[in-house]
Each structure stands twice: as C-alpha cells, then as structure tokens.
C-alpha cells in the first residue's frame, strides 16, 4: 500500500530526508513529484522511527522541500525483463535510449537478485574463447567465473572490453551466448565508441547495453550494475543462455559509493571509502556463477582503473579478495605500442586449470602455458640484468631467452583489434615461440607433448 508525504525536512547531495513517516522499509522504491508535475524515482537508504533517508536516482537538482511530494510505493526496485532487450541500449536506470519502443516486460525482477543457496552452486568449468591469446592461452576465462581486468587511466581497457564482448563465445554453443554490458560514469565519447563498436560489428544483436554517463547523477551508478546483472540472471536461468557480463568502470561505481557515504555522514574507512565497500562489491561479484540443474551461466569481467596504477588501492585490493584472479594491463607494454597491453606475469586466472586440457581446449594447454610463463619470466629477469652488465656478458641460451621475451610480446601478446584467434592458433603460436629455445630448456613440458606439438617434429611427421 502506497503512502504519500510532503514532509521533506532537508535535501543535500543526492539525498532527501522525509519526516513523520510510518511503515517505511529499507530498499523501498519512492516516487518523487515536483510542483511542475515532473516525476523522479528514489530508494529508501535508511528508515528510522518517523524518519526516512531517500536517495534520488535522477539527482535532487531543482527540488524544493516545500513543494515536492514523496510517495512510498511499498515495493522494492524492480527491472522489467524480456528477451526483446537483446539488441537494445538503455540508460543507467533501464530506460531505452536507442530510439526504439519501450520494452513490454515478460516479468519484473528485483534488482538485488534472488538469494542463491551456496549448496546449489555448480563449480565453474568450460572454456570461454575470447579470441585474445594472452587471455585464452595464459589466463583462461572459465564459464561461471568472475575475472576482473585491472587497468590504469589512459590504457585501452575500453577497446579490450569491446573486443571481448564482440568475440567471446562458448565453443559449440554460439547460438545461446549473450553479452550484458554495463558502463558507469563514462564520457559521451566513450558511450559513442561502445555504441558504434557493437552496432557496426553486429555484436549488438546478442547484447544488452546499459550506459550511465559521467554527467548522470552519481546515484544511478549504484543501480546500473545491478540492473545489468538482473537481466543477465533472467537470460541465463530462465532461457539457459551463457551470459558474459562486462562492467566498466568499477572505480566510478566505488567513487559514487563514497560520495553517497559522505553525504550520509558515515564514518569513512580506508581512503574515505565506506567500511562496507567489501560487502557491497561482493553483492555484485557474487552474482556470477552456475546453478546445479540449470544449463545457463553468468560469467563476469569487471573492469576497474587503478588510481595512480596502485594495485594496493582499496578498490583493486578488495576486488582481488572476492574475484577469481585478475588480468593486469601494463603501461610499459602500452608505451611499446603493444595492444592489448596484458602483462601475463602479475595476471592470474585461479580457475584456469578447470577449464583447459584434454576435452576442453587441448591436451598440451596446461603444460604449454606453464612453460611460456616460465620462459617469459626468465627473459624479463635477464632484461634487468642486461641493464647492469650488458648483453655481451650473457650466454647463448640467455640471449635466446631475451629473443623469446621480445617476440612473445610482439607476436603472442600483441594482436589486432579485429583479430580473433582460435584456441588452436593461440597454442600453435606458443609452440612456435618455444622453438626459439633449446629443447633442453623446455623442462615444464613432457617429452611426448614436445614430440607431438613442437614445430620441429610436426614438420617431420607432415
């Protein structure tokens, strides 16, 4: 049952305080009406005796405490969902912005999702091919995983996100794959880039886009990822689709969280962020996964820009605790002109072992990835040594490692923006690069794998 009040006592930032209320609950949806008849939406952030704190999604600009009325609807925030959302673009709170008609909903779902019994979760398995060698070969994405991308200001994470959204597929199940893309706090230029990228390549047909712009109220950023995940859950668990959710930029989301926390005059935690930020991020990241008895899955790739490239900053730090690895973009590789500038050494996919190997990618994949990692690490270490003693002091084997490291970056990590490599191409390229090294140095690969996949022996057998 809805209740209407005109007893607003204070408006500050994105918040308003309504006094003299009764029976108001946390999370309840609020409809706000101005003197001119304009309507806005909000949500109850805090409900105390005779008082409610409301966050206004469209912002509090031009609202007057004397002439504004507030109606408490008695419902939680719900998003209308339908299969017709595929191929559509929405703003941060779910309104169409692509010129198309309003969505006729098949259902309305709570944006906070349904609680998922941990026992009902199925373990993430099955390889997702992104077409990017540094991810597929070295830090494999697995269906049901949450694997963030740690980037920095000015690095090409937007291009990487668009490329993954365009190319990602579960092998053998392309027809049931969908992408839900949510952008928070992006500029008009970035929004146009994403629209153009999805529309020109045809990827929009299997995608749902939510775009929250930088000049939209910060409070919208709190809702946008939850809207996206609610749609993803609907596609995955009602229609058995394999859904990849890309969230960018989670740093903007956390800044909005800090802004609202400051407006509520809460005691700040590390660097001014609220003490509950870990819990809040978990309510987003933990909505990835698979459910026993359901064919569909939700895989998450949140993207965040690390302030000052600091991986110990609270946002990447807390994200790392919740998620299952990280893909780290390197400013040094970016300066070398390498795209995508993925640094495979600090990058990690904790579930990689469960999504690769015989029957999933190829039998040599686990050993090949370990050998490539070890050889590249050795080559990087020798670069530092060369800076001190010079290349003349190195052995012939050491020089081979240096050559390997250079070619690994130029040929394996680097690839074109429209280059979509299959997993076979990625693994074969890895073996081609390992052929630079003496066979005696391939200590992490079994002899039978060398005999079967090493270019020297494959050429003989063919």
Swiss-Prot record:
Domain of life: Archaea
GO terms, molecular function: ATP binding; proton-transporting ATP synthase activity, rotational mechanism
Location(s) in or outside the cell: Cell membrane
Cellular component annotations (GO), alphabetically ordered: plasma membrane; proton-transporting two-sector ATPase complex, catalytic domain
Chief place where the protein resides: membrane
Keyword Membrane in annotation: yes
PROSITE patterns: ATPASE_ALPHA_BETA (PS00152)
Role according to the record: Component of the A-type ATP synthase that produces ATP from ADP in the presence of a proton gradient across the membrane. The B chain is a regulatory subunit.
The family this protein is said to belong to: Belongs to the ATPase alpha/beta chains family.
NCBIfam families assigned to the protein according to its UniProt record, in alphabetical order: ATP_syn_B_arch, PRK04196.1
Subunit structure: Has multiple subunits with at least A(3), B(3), C, D, E, F, H, I and proteolipid K(x).
Name of this chain's protein: A-type ATP synthase subunit B
Higher taxonomy: Archaea, Methanobacteriati, Methanobacteriota, Thermococci, Thermococcales
